[in-house]
Swiss-Prot record:
It is found in: Cytoplasm. Involved in mRNA degradation. Catalyzes the phosphorolysis of single-stranded polyribonucleotides processively in the 3'- to 5'-direction. The gene is pnp. InterPro entries: ExoRNase_PH_dom1 (IPR001247), ExoRNase_PH_dom2 (IPR015847), ExoRNase_PH_dom2_sf (IPR036345), KH_dom (IPR004087), KH_dom_type_1 (IPR004088), KH_dom_type_1_sf (IPR036612), NA-bd_OB-fold (IPR012340), PNPase (IPR012162). GO terms for molecular function: 3'-5'-RNA exonuclease activity; magnesium ion binding; polyribonucleotide nucleotidyltransferase activity; RNA binding. This is Polyribonucleotide nucleotidyltransferase. Its EC number is 2.7.7.8. GO terms for cellular component: cytosol. CDD domains: KH-I_PNPase, RNase_PH_PNPase_2. One of its GO terms (biological process) is RNA processing. It comes from Campylobacter jejuni subsp. doylei (strain ATCC BAA-1458 / RM4099 / 269.97). Its cofactor is Mg(2+). It catalyses: RNA(n+1) + phosphate = RNA(n) + a ribonucleoside 5'-diphosphate. Keywords: Cytoplasm, Magnesium, Metal-binding, Nucleotidyltransferase, RNA-binding, Transferase.
Length: 718
């Protein structure tokens, strides 16, 4: 059975009861993209008290007419992009599972055909949402996901991939009806063109350069965009419900009833409440856990407890602890560590504590500590990523890796490959910091965050430490960026918004809302809600309270930058210069022989831009780089047939304002070389000939506009 639904600028076609019928399968089409979403569950419940949900998102190479690269020509482990999309689907759907649901459940989304224009993340979430709604798992309504962009100052709903390239905002929102469940946002920087005059070995050039806008969003702009998203989500959720409610399977599922133990609850509250409250309020994280364990053992050893199971005692103790934490916050405005609701934990900062690293920062906030290290490299160090919707691999020049070892929370667990959580936290920090790093910065940058101690907000500590580590490595970042994690306690129509939450408040609270940005606005945010939805007024308070906390942290970070001493000795050196683009082939040599010899001889790395004639040499010592540059200049100026610049000719009889009927001898990306007389050329900059379709040997009337350093620049005669 097929349904075609027109919602939120998209035409979505769903086939139900057609494929994967042993599970609940939905085939969704949008444009030329085809996605299969399936939901399957086990018949037996798990004993543990958690939601056993697994989400997998798989992009098939054949969907884009590709064969997987590498030695193994098939899909193997998921890429980082696939893992992050799976996390988005998981975080959007998880809050809607009913309390007491304990059946192992798997949601699989497979991309079978990929249209480069279609947003696969939004499409995949909506396909998974419909499949879940059609299953026998009780869901109150289908989830809907949307993306909001901003082009020319206007918010647009569900931009396609081409439009997103020109957007200054990427806001992904999921919700059900009028409730928001999950938010991911990042600011997208753009470049502003400027003209500058630069002197180069081949020719002085008036060229285009760029400056970068971070495009942070204000709190009011975020709320405006979320309002647009909320309306679209309501529209989509209603449309899915109307189309598919009559096809939903009857639910025969038994939910686990939470077994109440009023006698245990009364006993603990009457006899141990003061001890529990003392443990919560007066202890550090590790001491608190130890003290609560002592209380549990004391109860278990009592004669009265012999009639109660250990599980019921521990569960009831956890409930009492949760209740006391929440009541204290709501009724007294006081948190477990004594802070007020909007207070940030004490912060300490040390920079460049690792003598041989390019840049480092030890950022400590309360009992959360991140060691963030910046490393600079050449173009060959960039991460190559093969995306399904891109024809060729793309180069990632700014990387953030987040590591969370077990010892950071006092656990004796082996350190393994990064999991979904590590990838997600690293991606959030990258999104927050990326707008502050100029895209034209010549070095590849890798930030590594080692979480040494964790008691909440470790991803935001990574953002703060990362921004300072960039400064410590001498990276000219546009602005400092800081992040803060916000929390929410909601009970009986009373609520409290918490700034800089610790682990206890994250675990026993109702929201995890991370906000990062500069003093001028927000660069990234992420929200996960446990309530089943949040209203705009609460969201507004959280955003403005986060701004207050963020600026407080940035003020401390600004003071710390005054103490930074960049270790120039360990930083890589780089030289960027231009040659005649036609000479790039001489630098490379036959089958790359010449460039390999240069790299081996001088111990440097070399990157070439054939179109612009740019040469980038990187190395550890200035002497090596200078020697390699001189060697390359010698190659490009000594090849047979090389046309030498005007500085090698006698230009003493040329004057400003002289007019010539010249001949176009060569066309380069930055302009045209026009022969004036006696083999002397003048440069006609590209900005002066945008409206012309020039060709070599074309006759052109020009006049001299500048003579400098033996070189001539010309303009067109009017």
């Amino acid at each position: 059975m097929q349904y075609s639904i027109e919602i939120n600028k998209n035409t979505e076609i769903f086939d139900i009861d057609k494929v994967a019928k042993q599970a609940t399968g939905v085939l969704m089409r949008q444009g030329k993209s085809v996605v299969l979403a399936t939901v399957a569950r086990e018949e037996k419940q798990v004993e543990e008290d958690f939601l056993p949900l697994t989400v997998q998102y798989i992009e098939k190479a054949y969907a884009a007419g590709k064969i997987p690269g590498g030695y193994v020509k098939r899909e193997t482990k998921p890429s980082d992009a696939e893992t992050l999309t799976a996390r988005i689907i998981d975080r959007s759907l998880r809050p809607l599972f009913p309390k007491g649901y304990a059946y192992p459940t798997q949601i699989v989304v497979m991309v079978l055909s990929a249209d480069p224009k279609v947003d696969l993340q939004v499409m995949s979430l909506n396909a998974a949402s419909v499949a879940l709604y059609l299953s026998d798992i009780p869901m109150k309504a289908p989830v809907c996901g949307v993306r909001i962009g901003k082009i020319d100052g206007n918010f647009i709903l569900n931009p396609n991939n081409e439009e997103l390239q020109n957007s200054t905002l990427d806001l992904y929102v999921a919700g059900v009806k009028d409730e928001l469940l999950m938010i991911e946002m990042r600011a997208l920087p753009d470049q502003k063109e400027n003209e500058i005059f630069i002197e180069a070995p081949y020719a002085d050039v008036l060229t285009q350069t760029t400056s970068q806008n971070m495009n942070e969003l204000s709190e009011d702009e975020i709320l405006e965009a979320l309002n647009l998203a909320q309306k679209a989500i309501l529209n989509g959720s209603n449309a899915y419900e109307e189309a598919f409610s009559k096809h939903k399977k009857n639910s025969q599922i038994e939910l686990k009833n939470e077994i109440e133990h009023p006698e245990i609850l009364a006993f603990i509250e009457n006899n141990f409440q003061k001890q529990i409250k003392k443990a919560i309020n007066q202890m550090a994280k590790s001491e608190r856990a130890s003290e609560l364990n002592k209380i549990a053992k004391e109860i278990l050893n009592l004669e009265i407890a012999k009639d109660w199971s250990e599980e019921s005692i521990l569960n009831t103790l956890a409930k009492v602890k949760r209740k006391l934490i929440r009541e204290q916050i709501l009724n007294e405005g006081k948190r477990a560590d004594g802070r007020s609701l909007n207070e940030v934990r004490p912060i300490s900062i040390e920079t460049n504590i690792l003598p041989n690293a390019h840049g480092s920062c030890l950022f400590t906030r309360g009992q959360t500590q991140a060691l963030v290290v910046a490393t600079l490299g050449g173009e060959n160090d960039a991460q190559m990523i093969d995306l399904l919707t891109e024809k060729n691999p793309i180069s990632e020049r700014f990387m953030v890796n987040y590591n969370f070892p077990g010892f950071s929370v006092g656990e004796a667990s082996p350190i393994k490959a990064p999991g979904r959580r590590e990838l997600g936290h690293g991606n959030l920090a990258k999104r927050a910091l990326y707008p502050s790093v100029d895209e034209n910065y010549p070095y590849v940058i890798r930030l590594v965050s080692e979480i040494l101690e964790s008691n909440g907000s470790s991803s935001m500590a990574t953002v703060c430490g990362g921004s300072l580590a960039l400064k410590a490595a001498g990276v000219p970042s546009l602005k400092l960026v800081a992040g803060v994690a916000m929390g929410l306690i909601f009970e009986d129509n009373k609520y409290a918004v918490l700034t800089d939450i610790m682990g206890l408040e994250d675990h026993d609270g109702d929201m995890d809302f991370k906000v990062a940005g500069s003093k001028d606005g927000i660069t990234a945010l992420q929200m996960d809600i446990k309530l089943g939805g949040i209203d705009q007024e609460t969201l507004k308070q959280a955003l403005y309270q986060a701004k207050e906390g963020r600026i407080h942290i940035l003020n401390i970070m600004e003071e710390a930058t005054k103490e930074i001493i960049v270790n120039e000795e360990v930083l890589p050196k780089l030289e960027l210069f231009s040659v005649d683009p036609s000479k790039i082939v001489d630098i490379i040599g036959q089958a790359g022989k010449t460039i390999k010899e240069i790299i081996e001889k001088f111990g440097v790395s070399i990157d070439l831009d054939r179109e612009k004639g740019e040469v980038k040499i990187a190395g550890s010592q200035n002497e090596q780089i200078k020697a390699a540059k001189d060697y390359i200049i010698n190659i490009t100026s000594s090849q047979k047939g090389t046309k030498k610049g005007s500085k090698d000719k006698d230009i003493s009889d040329f004057e400003l304002g002289q007019e010539f009927q010249g001949i176009v001898k060569k066309i380069a990306p930055f302009g045209a070389f026009v022969e004036l007389k006696n083999g002397v050329d003048g440069l006609l900059h590209s900005s002066k000939i945008k409206h012309l379709d020039l060709s070599e040997n074309q006759s052109l009337k020009v006049k001299i506009s500048e003579i400098k350093n033996g070189k001539i620049s010309v303009d067109l005669c009017e």
